Amino acid sequence: MIVKISRLVAPLALVLCLAQASLSYSVLTHQAIIDSVWNDSLKPLLLKRFPSATEEQLREAHAHAYGGAIIQDMGYYPFSSKLFTDLTHYVRSGDFIEALIAESQDLNEYAFALGALAHYAADTNGHAKGTNRAVPVVYPKLRARYGDEVTYADDPTSHIRLEFGFDVVQVARGRYASDAYHDFIGFKVAKDVMKRAFAKIYGVEMKDIFTNLDFAIGNYRRTVSGLIPEMTKVAWELKKDDIEKNSPGITRDKFVYNLSRADYEKEYGKDYEKPGFGAKMTAWFVRIVPKVGPFKALAFKPPTPEAERMFMESFNATIDRYQAMLAQVNGGKLDLQNADFDTGRPTRAGEYKLADETYAKLLEKLAKDDFKTTSPELRRDILAFYNDLSAPIATKKDKSDWRDTLRALDKLKAAQAEPTRANSK
């Protein structure tokens, strides 16, 4: 009986993990942003710093830019680190991108860093101008409760449903070619520069928050490789007439993207969690009860024309903003604000629940090591965040957690700002 229960708990936990994802844009959209600026802005910037790069090397760099564009979301997926994603979304988000760029040493690391800059532009813009405004349009009851802006923290389920709906609509309209799906799945991760930048900005080594980084990346890729075919299947089922009208002669076999497990492992290896009984049960539950309990977040919700317009406007604005940021990099004048990715607003205490919670988690983790890896810059940032303790900080809701936060804060104030282990490596 215990074995049977554990097998049922596994798929439930998997879906709950996926349902926690706070996505302004999907993996497809994040990577499409890279393609939109590649020839005019991104490739010339790479060639300016590395003028001898060959076309083959640039293709490899393109794959690393894809990886950078989605890396901040990796922690939302199974067998990864949610703390990694929360930190890069809510704590020193701009500083982390600038550190990636500054720490990059070769073509691939530079491309990866500039890809991560695209994620910054997309999330800070996409939530504020797109999803947060579109959700209340599609869900009138949420508008009545929260007003004209509904954040992910307000209602995670609506955000996830609507983002999937945007994806399906874009896939149905032929925004992506089959070759693009293959390239998207083949994203590369510049692990060394990511590790250096992360330790520099957060005072925490990535090995201390990831059980196995390579395994986490492999599972991320494998999840994406399964998600893309599912999007094409749903798009065909729901928008078949429109697809056939826009592409005469198209068939289901031609439209639906397929990547067999054998082909996947031949190209990308076997470093991922194999789909056993638990994964099969997850798929069965999602098909049978998509609107019940934790599975309700995975139900499809098509965007209204107005919501879709908001999404496209935010996407176009993101492209413009990203190109402007790349121009700043080119001129050596990039100065990013530490913004909350879910709202697009400057990070400050009491502004957003998830930011409050993440600062508290980082403070607690650093305190366990007596702040020995806390740089002067990180120390100043944390103290500035907690400068006004009268702010409506979400951590206060749990008296025990708040006491722990205050104790750690007092300990940090007493700590001397001196060179740290994380920065001296």
Locate the predicted segments by residue.
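Short, linear, compositionally biased motifs with a strong N-terminal bias
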Residues: 12-15
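Catalytic glutamate of the conserved HExxH
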Residues: 116, 120-124
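N-terminal, motif-rich segments that launch catalysis or mediate targeting to/interaction with membranes
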Residues: 23-111, 124-208, 223, 237-242, ...
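Bacterial N-terminal signal peptides that target proteins for export
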Residues: 1-10
